[in-house]
């Protein structure tokens, strides 16, 4: 089952933008808190609540892994992933 998350994405040399991503709950291997990066400050300038939490997730895709910064605390992301599994 896929879970919809909101990713903070910043292509090299460009501004941060928000994008919806759908990930398989079984493909997420780690979730950790993300704070203090300049990308987060740019995101807050886009209108994201200043109290919002962010997490960095690791996604396993066909033998390769990639990371993504998403909106939500690690507990919130885990709850979304677990909701799909139950």
Q: What is the predicted role of each segment?
A:
Residues 2-3, 9-86:
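Acidic, Ser/Thr- and proline-rich intrinsically disordered linker/docking segments
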């Amino acid at each position: 089952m896929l879970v919809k998350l909101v990713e903070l994405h910043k292509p090299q040399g460009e501004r941060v933008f928000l994008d919806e991503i759908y990930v398989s709950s079984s493909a997420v291997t780690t979730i950790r808190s993300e704070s203090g990066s300049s990308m987060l400050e740019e995101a807050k300038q886009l209108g994201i609540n200043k109290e919002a939490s962010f997490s960095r997730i690791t996604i396993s895709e066909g033998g390769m892994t990639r990371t993504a910064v998403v909106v939500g605390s690690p507990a919130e992301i885990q709850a979304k992933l677990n909701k799909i599994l139950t």
